[in-house]
């Protein structure tokens, strides 16, 4: 039998305990993996072992897929009404609200984000997402299409079947909600793999999924490595769709595996190198505040982080000074500490990756204007870092770093800055700051990006679509658009009085 992980917190911001089954969640129960191997889960705040979780192998994926198929053919899919699916989703959201402190603490423990941030942002958005799709479950309509008087013609939106979902470590619970919400609302069954770095909130959610009344096999959670468990999901011949959030590099591998197997439907939400354009007429105070939020939220570990900050020459010096002052106010430390703004990066691997980019920036001739060093003596903490004196060909300007590192770049001409902003392989998001609303909207429309923020940054809502252009992905998360990711459209032609 799988072990139970328990943990007690007695901190300035939270006092409580949790209990998490560390097994694989297959067919409505926790089980050991076939090979009974485990993965270490590490606390990024101190580098110490939290617990061990079961590792899913290809054989475990086969078992999970069979359970999902059985549920789809018997208790879910077209065998369960949209209103019943919606009731269960809403019950799940209520249980998340009831357990919000527990889930927030778990998120802070293995991810490193602060407890207060996890509660106010991640959990709030996760709950609103599940509620949003609870409302959609009985409203996924087709339409009657007028052709001629001899026929009745209409469309149906039908669930795809068994979907594989692979989620990242930067927003573990939120990405789970983004994935399972629309998939369950439309009647699909799920085999989901959380990141091996941050699996605990997904495993805790399995107990809530049980309590909410979802039939066995509808949601299966399999923990493991991307190269093995993720690969097995992407290439499985009986999985009808795969949805992946993560790096563009791995997204290519997922798409390739999907194509080489059964040409399964693919949704990808991938990397970004988002531009922020600040014109001379911008509200200086607000642009500083929003830009800091856009770059440093979640410790810079966000695909839509505004890392290329273009500031018009008329306010460049003032902006840089105020932005520097703002950055120096950011307080790093224990995710369960009082007044902490930024915790550690998620892992040693990610810490090393970010520090290598900082060294690359120095080596290529950029200036570290602020930050650029490790913080403290333990854990994976990195100072918020800004480069100046960059050129477009530098790695820190071109490549996604996925950490608290950005570049502030001076520009002169409004038309030229759009070319610079769009000069990227990515196109996930962009932001513009100007008090001239016509100029701001014109700039927003000129961005080659799936999301454009005007006088704000990194604002997300469950009802608003999110996704990328170019190498930032395929398909859209959130809102009504996400339902399309999980449905097949069937056209039905009914002969009324057409004689041959």
Swiss-Prot record:
Its EC number is 1.2.1.3. It comes from the Eukaryota. This is Aldehyde dehydrogenase. GO terms for biological process: ethanol catabolic process. The record marks 170 as: Transition state stabilizer. Keywords: NAD, Oxidoreductase. NAD(+) binds at residues 246-251. The active site is at 269 (proton acceptor), 303 (nucleophile). CDD domains: ALDH_AldA_AN0554. It catalyses: an aldehyde + NAD(+) + H2O = a carboxylate + NADH + 2 H(+). Pathway: Alcohol metabolism; ethanol degradation; acetate from ethanol: step 2/2. GO terms for molecular function: aldehyde dehydrogenase (NAD+) activity. Belongs to the aldehyde dehydrogenase family.
